[in-house]
């Protein structure tokens, strides 16, 4: 007992020290215009490096030397990070103007949302009071029979404290329909590996310290807070053990189990899902997709075996952590101490104006970006992107016609699917209507909760209705692109259609190396190990023959071996982490898409130049068009990252920049020819891998 008390005392001393993490004054930094991002930056090239030995160092070396990771970022890239910085500033200009002098009801709505977030004096004045009703409702819970009612009430108010994930999604076997889906969830950390892996042992210790501090801020006594924190970690660890791992969960076919509601309730009879579904206004449905049945069996055992006090601690924790950034500075600092410093490796939090810009975009994305898109993405840019995508699709079609591992039946099905892909470029045809969302300039927590209720209501309203094929899954300020297998669509938000990815004023080589490779990457997802399970209508129906499926796996095994043998990061004794190798299987889909996207984009460039009477051997600024293509591709992935790459391969199938560049060009012979490499050099190996 004395040893236990000593351990608690030492931990709480650490907690006290952790409640004022350094650097939080950065919240008050004011916006400054970020520098413009060049489409191709020849000054970034490290000419002391050999392109045939380490192309990433050659293309990015000087940029890496001159662009350290900012203290409020976990990593910094020449493309995604720099462009996100620019877009945030442009969005801030819209929000700042709307907050001070709105010119329309829509501008007043998002201007008030932003202003409420920025008013930290009022946040301090209100303290924890906005959460008191929810915390009291949890405190009044007397037994496990009331869990369904409580989590439903919390969800209906905008909180997210469920131990699972409930949503309305497309029916995997009939993509024209939308059905209820329920699956694993309930964890605070980014991935189940954080709870189970030895690599994250120290992170878990810090997690307990963080939760203890948060509970103490909310009024718990020290030992009580520590015990509550341990109980939450144990609970979430049990949920993690019951959850599918990162590789399995990406296999869509394994997570489709249509079940009637009564049979689903039998999986977890101790949690009244009927009360929950009614409480969140889910509407009437007789069947649902139970994606992870075993998870709910385990959840039921936990409900029966854990005391009601443990569940109350779990629910209180999820209410606190979900709203931490809307609470007084002590909570924000503590939230940053763990999720920012420990998990994301940031030294300082984002300035408040950035946090509020991101929060407003998340809540009112279509409202905020309507005016922004008009000023930053012209109709002519959209037309240029339309033409580029059409050229890429033709190149992919030509490749499908000649792939040696693909038989006639599979080839025909692949061409049919390609012809049915829909491209959404820039912005939606119809903007989301936020008229039903009430925004109060003096109620930050209320705005956040009402926004969550609005989003949940919009999602639940889809049940039983035809799918809106023109709906976007992300806001237009998102610097990313994605392929949706259920929609069979490739989507390019306006935010990514800017330099360095896309510039209608620069030579085609750089555009094809930038956005062209990204688009080719997304297109090949329609035909990878998961894309092959969905037909052109988005239905879960395999269109590869059994023999061709076997040949496809044989082709990809080469990439599994190629990437899987490489060291991602050396061990770090100071941070509880051994050497990490790349996981060739976990990253296979993304690696295959990188390789396919590069090849398709290059062929599309070659054909585009030929149609203009030009050649890939023509020179601009001392580099041939094909060299500029590969440089444009590589410089998209120029990045600096501190420590995180060591654990990144465990949780992220997207590899770090050096491998996305070097691992890809090694497999494309045209690269070796472009830079006059000798066969056998690292970037021009004697043997290589090819799927597409």
What are these regions (language model features)?
Residues 63-67, 189-190, 500:
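Short, solvent-exposed loop/turn elements at domain surfaces
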Residues 45-65, 194-216, 588, 596-600:
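Hydrophobic/aromatic-rich, well-ordered segments within soluble, folded domains that form packed cores
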Residues 33-36, 49-54, 58-128:
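Active-site-surrounding "flap" and adjacent substrate/cofactor-binding loops of secreted or lumenal enzymes
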């Amino acid at each position: 007992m004395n040893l236990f008390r000593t351990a608690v005392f030492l931990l709480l001393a650490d907690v006290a020290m952790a409640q004022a993490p350094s650097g939080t004054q950065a919240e008050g930094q004011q916006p400054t215009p970020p520098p413009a991002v060049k489409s191709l930056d020849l000054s970034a090239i490290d000419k002391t490096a050999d392109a045939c030995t380490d192309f990433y160092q050659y293309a990015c070396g000087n940029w890496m030397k001159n662009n350290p990771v900012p203290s409020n970022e976990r990593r910094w890239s020449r493309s995604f990070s720099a462009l996100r910085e620019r877009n945030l500033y442009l969005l801030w200009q819209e929000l700042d103007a709307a907050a001070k002098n709105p010119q329309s009801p829509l501008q007043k709505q998002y201007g008030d949302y932003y202003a409420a977030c920025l008013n930290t004096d009022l946040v301090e004045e209100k303290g924890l009071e906005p959460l008191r009703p929810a915390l009291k409702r949890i405190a009044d819970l007397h037994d496990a029979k009331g869990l369904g009612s409580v989590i439903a009430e919390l969800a209906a108010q905008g909180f997210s404290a469920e131990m699972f994930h409930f949503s309305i999604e497309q029916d995997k076997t009939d993509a024209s329909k939308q059905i209820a889906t329920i699956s694993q969830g309930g964890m605070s950390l980014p991935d189940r590996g954080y709870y189970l892996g030895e690599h994250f042992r120290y992170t878990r210790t810090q997690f307990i310290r963080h939760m203890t501090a948060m509970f103490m801020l909310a009024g718990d006594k020290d030992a009580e807070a520590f015990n509550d924190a341990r109980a939450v970690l144990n609970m979430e660890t049990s949920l993690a053990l019951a959850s599918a791992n990162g590789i399995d969960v990406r296999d869509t076919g394994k997570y489709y189990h249509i079940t009637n509601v009564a049979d689903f309730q039998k999986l977890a009879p101790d949690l009244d899902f009927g009360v929950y579904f009614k409480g969140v206004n889910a509407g009437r449905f007789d069947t649902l997709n139970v994606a992870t049945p075993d998870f709910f069996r385990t959840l039921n055992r936990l409900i029966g075996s854990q005391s009601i006090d443990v569940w109350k601690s779990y629910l209180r924790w999820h209410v606190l952590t979900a709203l931490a950034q809307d609470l007084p500075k002590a909570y924000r600092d503590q939230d940053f101490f763990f999720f920012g410093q420990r998990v994301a490796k940031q030294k300082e939090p984002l300035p408040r104006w950035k946090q509020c810009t991101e929060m407003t975009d998340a809540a009112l994305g279509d409202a905020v970006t309507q005016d922004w898109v008009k000023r930053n993405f012209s109709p002519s840019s959209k037309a240029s992107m339309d033409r580029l995508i059409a050229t890429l699709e033709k190149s992919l079609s030509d490749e499908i016609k000649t792939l040696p591992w693909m038989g006639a039946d599979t080839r025909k099905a692949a061409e049919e699917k390609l012809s049915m892909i829909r491209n959404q470029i820039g912005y939606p045809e119809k903007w989301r209507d936020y008229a039903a969302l009430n925004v109060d300039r003096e109620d930050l927590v209320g705005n956040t909760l009402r926004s969550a209720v609005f989003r949940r209501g919009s999602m639940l309203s889809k049940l039983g209705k035809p799918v809106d094929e023109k709906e976007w899954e992300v806001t237009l300020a998102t610097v990313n692109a994605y392929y949706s297998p259920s929609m069979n669509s490739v989507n390019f938000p306006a935010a990514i259609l800017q330099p360095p990815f896309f510039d209608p004023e620069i030579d085609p080589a750089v555009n094809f190396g930038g956005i062209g490779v990204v688009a080719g990457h997304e297109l090949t997802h329609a035909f990878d190990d998961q894309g092959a399970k969905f037909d052109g209508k988005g239905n879960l129906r395999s269109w590869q023959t059994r023999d061709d499926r076997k040949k496809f796996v044989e082709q990809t095994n080469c990439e599994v071996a190629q990437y899987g043998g490489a060291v991602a990061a050396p061990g770090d004794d100071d941070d509880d982490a051994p050497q990490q190798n790349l996981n060739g299987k976990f990253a296979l889909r993304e690696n295959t898409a990188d390789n396919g996207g590069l090849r398709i984009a290059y062929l599309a460039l070659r054909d585009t130049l030929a149609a203009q009477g030009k050649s890939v051997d023509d020179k601009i600024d001392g580099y041939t068009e094909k060299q500029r293509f590969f440089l444009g591709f590589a410089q998209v992935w120029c990045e600096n990252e501190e420590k995180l790459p060591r654990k990144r391969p465990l949780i992220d199938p997207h590899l770090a920049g050096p491998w996305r560049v070097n691992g890809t060009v090694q497999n494309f012979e045209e690269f070796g020819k472009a830079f006059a490499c000798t066969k056998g050099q690292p970037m021009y190996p004697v043997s290589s891998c090819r799927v597409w």
